[in-house]
């Protein structure tokens, strides 16, 4: 239903990328098209180029990494998606798994952080700043009777401009936690505290 270009490509003219989206949309292969991992200006450029011609496929979504550990999209991408009225999809809302708390006491042997293939993906979020945020999420979870996963997902879900979060589960327990997060609401005082500890 939704086909997104994975990332901006400096080697490919933007018009070629957008033409590929048009082809998928107009042929019925995709009901909606979007962009992923574009900066604010790149997003605005792609969206407005498509809007200039009524027969072009409208950009429906942008997808970027967003979590308590990475709030960079709040500077440009979220304001862009809100101003241009397109959906925002947050990928890695659990901060590459770190916000679940599983790395608090080290790197579990069965985790992505222990995998030679994914260690470099997780490692940037194993620093002191991230540790402070993970501890704050744990304190909030303990106080509210939720899991850290539920707190982190609820925070992303309710962030201004977020349409949805892209989540993945390897186990039934993870899936249940993800689904439970839809049933909770974080008190404003907790949101404010998490905003403060995770601000840049």
Question: What name fits each language-model region?
Answer:
Residues 199-200:
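Short hydrophobic/aromatic patches at helix-to-coil boundaries
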